[in-house]
Amino acid sequence: MKVSVDKDACIGCGVCASICPDVFEMDDDGKAKALVAETDLECAKEAAESCPTGAITVE
């Protein structure tokens, strides 16, 4: 699955990094970033579904 984060939509709540720390972390600007471009981890989907702004895409 391909993972991406829309930095403009991200509000920096950190839910994704809490749910799936192997895939997401918060950058120096307080925004989420994907640590990997692709993953098979189901938590990436859960993080995308939990994102309050829909900033995470998992395809």
Curated annotation (Swiss-Prot):
Q: List the disulfide bonds.
A: C20-C43
User: Is 4Fe-4S included in the keywords of this UniProt record?
Assistant: yes
Limits of the 4Fe-4S ferredoxin-type domain: 2-29
Return the InterPro entries for the record. Answer: 3Fe4S_ferredoxin, 4Fe4S_Fe-S-bd, 4Fe4S_Fe_S_CS, Fe-S_cluster_ET
**Family matches, as Pfam families:** Fer4_15
Where does the signal sequence lie? none
Q: Which keywords, in A-to-Z order, does the entry hold?
A: 3Fe-4S, 4Fe-4S, Disulfide bond, Electron transport, Iron, Iron-sulfur, Metal-binding, Transport
Write down the species. Answer: Thermococcus litoralis
Query: Which residues are noted in the entry as [4Fe-4S] cluster-binding?
Result: C10, C13, C16, C51
The entry's protein name is Ferredoxin
PROSITE patterns per record: 4FE4S_FER_1 (PS00198), 4FE4S_FER_2 (PS51379)
TM helices/strands, residue ranges: none
Q: Which domain of life is it from?
A: Archaea
- Known cofactor(s): [4Fe-4S] cluster; [3Fe-4S] cluster
Q: What does this gene product do?
A: Ferredoxins are iron-sulfur proteins that transfer electrons in a wide variety of metabolic reactions.
